[in-house]
């Protein structure tokens, strides 16, 4: 079975437990914390995946790092991943869990590229407008400042891209001038 399929199974199981307990939001935030710890501390993953490290040492490190800081269900999932030598799947598990949780709540993540930072009011307006377009109740907007787009906005929601940036328009104009207009 591929790692992707295995990660999905762990995420679905964790999601179902979160649903039973009504803890979607807290699970998402705790899993994001775990993801950040693993991304910021590559040595942690190296230690937990090293074949010569004893399982008891791995458990002790997990307890020191996460016990009492995350829900017991999440902690137990980490222990199972370590015991089954699957801890390297933690980031895909977190991403899939987050996706399942957001889908259940009709939430989508949107990455908005702009030449300057957006105000909260602008983010709220974009959230309302584009949430309707993609059939979601709410968009969680992450603003990425990219001066290279010159002006306007470029929005990525899932696999959809809405490019209203000046750079995007200049790129289209350049292509048309080089190869002729599209029919």
Swiss-Prot record:
NCBIfam families: ATP_synt_delta (TIGR01145), PRK05758.2-4 (NF004403)
Entry similarity comment: Belongs to the ATPase delta chain family.
Cellular component aspect of the GO annotation: plasma membrane; proton-transporting ATP synthase complex
Source organism of the structure: Halalkalibacterium halodurans (strain ATCC BAA-125 / DSM 18197 / FERM 7344 / JCM 9153 / C-125) (Bacillus halodurans)
Location in or out of the cell: Cell membrane
UniProt GO MF annotations: proton-transporting ATP synthase activity, rotational mechanism
Taxon lineage: Bacteria, Bacillati, Bacillota, Bacilli, Bacillales
Official protein name in the record: ATP synthase subunit delta
Stored Pfam families: OSCP
